[in-house]
Amino acid sequence: MRVCVTGFNVDAVRAVAIEETVSQVTGVHAVHAYPRTASVVIWYSPELGDTAAVLSAITKAQHVPAELVPARAPHSAGVRGVGVVRKITGGIRRMLSRPPGVDKPLKASRCGGRPRGPVRGSASWPGEQNRRERRTWLPRVWLALPLGLLALGSSMFFGAYPWAGWLAFAATLPVQFVAGWPILRGAVQQARALTSNMDTLIALGTLTAFVYSTYQLFAGGPLFFDTSALIIAFVVLGRHLEARATGKASEAISKLLELGAKEATLLVDGQELLVPVDQVQVGDLVRVRPGEKIPVDGEVTDGRAAVDESMLTGESVPVEKTAGDRVAGATVNLDGLLTVRATAVGADTALAQIVRLVEQAQGDKAPVQRLADRVSAVFVPAVIGVAVATFAGWTLIAANPVAGMTAAVAVLIIACPCALGLATPTAIMVGTGRGAELGILVKGGEVLEASKKIDTVVFDKTGTLTRARMRVTDVIAGQRRQPDQVLRLAAAVESGSEHPIGAAIVAAAHERGLAIPAANAFTAVAGHGVRAQVNGGPVVVGRRKLVDEQHLVLPDHLAAAAVEQEERGRTAVFVGQDGQVVGVLAVADTVKDDAADVVGRLHAMGLQVAMITGDNARTAAAIAKQVGIEKVLAEVLPQDKVAEVRRLQDQGRVVAMVGDGVNDAPALVQADLGIAIGTGTDVAIEASDITLMSGRLDGVVRAIELSRQTLRTIYQNLGWAFGYNTAAIPLAALGALNPVVAGAAMGFSSVSVVTNSLRLRRFGRDGRTA
């Protein structure tokens, strides 16, 4: 079940309180609160859990005192993958909203789906919540601005008349307690929890001005109703503009949700039945016509079509799909009729995983924000102390309590840490959202900082720098042997292997029309080769190390042929029988077109580039020379890749590992920054820090550039927010800033931070990075 909550979108403490409170409800298995996206995901058993109890627990958690909340980060900040989603046993998506003036949550509404499993629900979420947020503030803007100007005008133009003060009071009263009610309520809730936030400062400042002016209305002193009214007017205007801007920042998830198909054509006993997509189950057959979106992840069982996978990979070139090929939900069938057997539905589809990953990243914090959090924890009490000291100083030293009160109110208003609270989450939200549009899935704040520090990029060779489409180029036979005989023996042994080289050997035998003899007793030697029994005798197929381990006799002319092939960048595969090598196969892989360009761009960024491979040194060196890589780690077994990455780290290098996310998974985890390329599988998403849905290598450069640009934006935002408060508070304390000007400046600072973050939406457009 997913619940959308308002009121804690910048409060990690509330998120932890919600997780702790909801986890105690019967039937709840796990709770993840995402403070940055104002959502809570609950995994529970429908037969045991009570939805009303869950919603009640969330409401209760809003008022848990801060000192009773465990000092930890929300669970959502530590999520490394999406495997837990598979534990969902049922549920529906709910939307919970607490509009101003309503103490109890609205009745949760069904957003689609069946109790049997998780569903995406309405594609308008979270955009719906943002529209609700804007509806909250816009009427208050229309109320506060005219009345605030009326209060100002009554003081400026009719101050000499006795009724002017009462007119200002009448105009300010609804502004203070109607337009400003969400702010006052927020301050009261914080006070109940013995905490404080930006609402506390605004409420204290405006109430001080309002109460003081009300007293002076009877006592005959100066009035500041216009100050209170205009401050609230500018604050609610700022909140409205902020909601509009952050709505643009959070569009990524809404756009992703809108990509999915809403209906599917289900094949039941040969008949077509149009059903909602959430009714399709694993194993069902669905028919997809030209122009339709493929509704679920699956495997093509019949038909041929070009499929637009740009939503998944970021590449605009259609991909040809035939029987046996896998397809992803939300991709578009362009020109053929396909029958697809569903292999993943609902929360298990690639699109759902992408949505969760983006949501996780947007709910995450960058380590740089820890400083901001520590400062914010003491910021509000410190500002209140400065305001009190300001009033006392003006009263005792300057003997001007009226100026002291004005300066104190200005201090409270100008110091509102809105910009500080928005600095990091808005940048992460926009940056990760733009990355998702480009097929770059970033796992949040920790990844951003790692991207800044890396100085070495290590590429796996097969499937990363190369296409992983091996083919046999040459067959060199020993004395008294024919090339076809050697190829038949090798194909027999490799017929039980799933290795790309083995598949290439078997394919070559089929292409030549050779009859492949039966083989048994297969034994794979990890990273070296394969042994099997063919025609009653042992046959060995593998690399030079396997030849040495098996003590096979290697004729000189075959050894020389192997060296020649390796120097040409090909892999030499030895075939052994009856204690000696009887032939050598040359297997080649083609380098990706953009490999050399990408390596050059990484060098231009000041990064060292290395290649890691199980190939022998000569073959590896030939490939490395072709793409411009200077450092080669050759003859590395799959299980030793982690050790090689660790060795580089021990040398003081900060390493990014780029691999296919399957056999490279341990090395991806070991690296300071793991980048899985060309795959959207669970393994890739779980193991890597960045997943590139496209197989194009330039995604590596774009991922690093986007991460670094996002981090720079965070630093810019924090610098502006800290600098703004550092400069403005002394000016306000000295009386150089009118409280009304302070309120406008406070709103401007928040909008400026969000606007700066929105610049990231231009990343990658027309060759620009931001």
Curated annotation (Swiss-Prot):
Enzyme Commission (EC) number: 7.2.2.8
Induction section of the entry: Induced by copper ions via CsoR.
Keyword set, alphabetical order: ATP-binding, Cell membrane, Copper, Copper transport, Ion transport, Magnesium, Membrane, Metal-binding, Nucleotide-binding, Translocase, Transmembrane, Transmembrane helix, Transport
Transmembrane segments: 141-161, 164-184, 193-213, 217-237, 377-397, 402-422, 718-737, 741-760
Residues annotated for Mg(2+) binding in this entry: D660, D664
Main location: membrane
Gene Ontology cellular-component annotations: membrane; peptidoglycan-based cell wall; plasma membrane
PANTHER family linked to this entry: ATP7, ISOFORM B (PTHR43520), P-TYPE CU(+) TRANSPORTER (PTHR43520:SF8)
Function, in words: Necessary for copper homeostasis and likely functions as a copper exporter. Also required for full virulence.
Family: Belongs to the cation transport ATPase (P-type) (TC 3.A.3) family. Type IB subfamily.
Protein name: Probable copper-exporting P-type ATPase V
Lineage of producing organism: Bacteria, Bacillati, Actinomycetota, Actinomycetes, Mycobacteriales
This protein's encoding gene: ctpV
